[in-house]
From Swiss-Prot:
Residue numbers binding 2,4-dihydroxypteridine 2: C47, L48, T49, D61, V62, M63, S64, E65, T66, G100, H101, I102, K135
Species classification: Bacteria, Pseudomonadati, Pseudomonadota, Gammaproteobacteria, Pasteurellales
Function: Catalyzes the dismutation of two molecules of 6,7-dimethyl-8-ribityllumazine, resulting in the formation of riboflavin and 5-amino-6-(D-ribitylamino)uracil.
Native organism: Actinobacillus pleuropneumoniae
UniProt gene name: ribE
Lumazine-binding repeats: from-to residues: 1-96, 97-193
Pathway in which the depicted protein is active: Cofactor biosynthesis; riboflavin biosynthesis; riboflavin from 2-hydroxy-3-oxobutyl phosphate and 5-amino-6-(D-ribitylamino)uracil: step 2/2
Record's protein name: Riboflavin synthase
NCBIfam families: PRK09289.1, PRK13020.1, ribE
Subunit structure: Homotrimer.
Length: 215
């Protein structure tokens, strides 16, 4: 599990595609301080398993489904990537629950500088938009962010200068593709309501109840 608080911006050293999957090597330092083979590191929000490492880089396999569902297949040498180690049991929970399992991608439609922040509008599919709500959590390239507002096909987030400095968002442009992970809580609630057995005793839990409770 991750929290969406980026620890380091690494750089792609090499990405080697082998048929339907790829092997990616990433230059990094901080996330390698206590790494072990088999550990997981989120790369632009994608949970990858470390298959080899040295003092300044690590390698991971990227499966075909991951290449299809995420933007990792578009990365090139020297592309900056957001990195976060899996959360330790005694770590601080600084963002929100992030699984590292990407739901899909979005496209940056607008970048609007403001006085003390920068507004990003992200356009994505209706399949993802159904889980994106005003003031809810969203993970963009592994970064835990709060949704400011939405419309039928896009949503906006406001990024403070510190986040732009400490992540790869400063390198993004209009048209850039980003990985999106919806808040896992909403997905579980939907499945709970849809798959409730017919013979189960009636519960007071409903969408209206959750809305009234502030969810």
């Amino acid at each position: 599990m991750f929290t969406g608080i980026i620890e380091e911006v690494g750089k792609i050293a090499q990405i080697h595609k082998q048929g339907e999957f790829a092997v990616v090597t990433i230059n990094a330092t901080k996330v390698l301080q206590d790494v072990h083979l088999g550990d997981t590191i989120a790369v632009n929000g994608v949970c990858l398993t470390v298959t080899s490492f040295s003092s300044n880089q690590f390698t991971a396999d990227v499966m075909s489904e991951t290449l299809k569902r995420t933007s990792l297949g578009e990365l090139k040498s020297n592309s900056p990537v957001n990195l976060e180690r899996a959360m330790a049991a005694n770590g601080r929970f600084g963002g929100h629950i992030v699984s590292g399992h990407i739901d899909g991608t979005g496209e940056i439609a607008e970048i609007t500088p403001a006085h003390n922040s920068t507004w990003y509008r992200i356009k994505t599919s209706p399949k993802l938009m159904r889980y994106i709500i005003e003031k809810g959590s969203i993970t963009i390239d592994g970064i835990s962010l709060t949704v400011v507002d939405t419309d039928d096909e896009s949503f906006r987030v406001s990024i403070i200068p510190h986040t732009i400095k400490e992540t790869n968002l400063g390198s993004k442009k209009i048209g850039s593709i980003v990985n999106l992970e919806n808040d896992i809580v909403g997905k579980y609630i939907e499945q709970f309501l849809l798959k409730k057995p017919a013979d189960e005793p009636k519960s007071n839990l409903s969408l209206d109840f959750l809305k009234q409770a502030g969810f």
